[in-house]
Amino acid sequence: MMSLAWPLFRVTEQAALAAWPQTGCGDKNKIDGLAVTAMRQALNDVAFRGRVVIGEGEIDHAPMLWIGEEVGKGDGPEVDIAVDPIEGTRMVAMGQSNALAVMAFAPRDSLLHAPDMYMKKLVVNRLAAGAIDLSLPLTDNLRNVAKALGKPLDKLRMVTLDKPRLSAAIEEATQLGVKVFALPDGDVAASVLTCWQDNPYDVMYTIGGAPEGVISACAVKALGGDMQAELIDFCQAKGDYTENRQIAEQERKRCKAMGVDVNRVYSLDELVRGNDILFSATGVTGGELVNGIQQTANGVRTQTLLIGGADQTCNIIDSLH
């Protein structure tokens, strides 16, 4: 897989460059469409046989690299792809920080093949690996992580998303004394930062997109962290209303057809088999993980984080275009 590291970095770079000029335009679907087109073109220039096993688009009716789509020149290694052309299209549309173009590669049949739906996610760094169990209440997990890290609960730092669906979790954590950092969007960046050396967070708990979950799992595994995840249907994420039930029923049918289970806890090894993983994230707007795209006197500057699981390397790549 390491031979694909440079092509992968170029793919996320091209998607970010396509989206960036529209920062602040207010139209997240336009931004997604530009990134998807650029990403597809870049993927089709790579000498490999790629297959999108999980991708974003269906939840919010955005453009997409569709699940099952074959990309690449048709020769070379067979590769599973998990993709989110822009994680945080709303943030780009509103001119806000922490938007990324992200993608992960792994050998064929290595990544969880699932619909684009909601996923509950729990991530810790290597020092707390083995201390999480998503089938337990969040409060139990927070206590177990604090114990594994040798920290009192009031020193534990949990990152999540500032979404109504997570308000109960935020309340649970704060009642324990845990310090909660609620981001507007961006759980891929939060997952990586949780596993980062000198990490700002000890644990990540979110309910977000399944594509971002599988992409995050690739980075978490490459960084030696731990993660568990659970697919949940639209009613469980958004509320049990009449208009949501049809979507939830369709999601459950798609899961059955793909051979995955709703409300089953998946371990990190079930999300990502093996360690031959590549993860790439290019900043669109500035954030904690990587810098956003910047206009300079000599051109446009991008910054990309490239993580290799086989050799557990992390590279920050600054490019001038």
Curated annotation (Swiss-Prot):
Record's keyword annotation contains Metal-binding: yes
Catalytic activity: beta-D-fructose 1,6-bisphosphate + H2O = beta-D-fructose 6-phosphate + phosphate
Segments forming a coiled coil: none
Enzyme Commission no: 3.1.3.11
Annotated GO biological process: fructose 1,6-bisphosphate metabolic process; gluconeogenesis; glycerol metabolic process
Cofactor(s) this protein cannot do without: Mn(2+)
Protein name according to UniProt: Fructose-1,6-bisphosphatase 2 class 2
Organism: Escherichia coli (strain K12)
Gene (UniProt): yggF
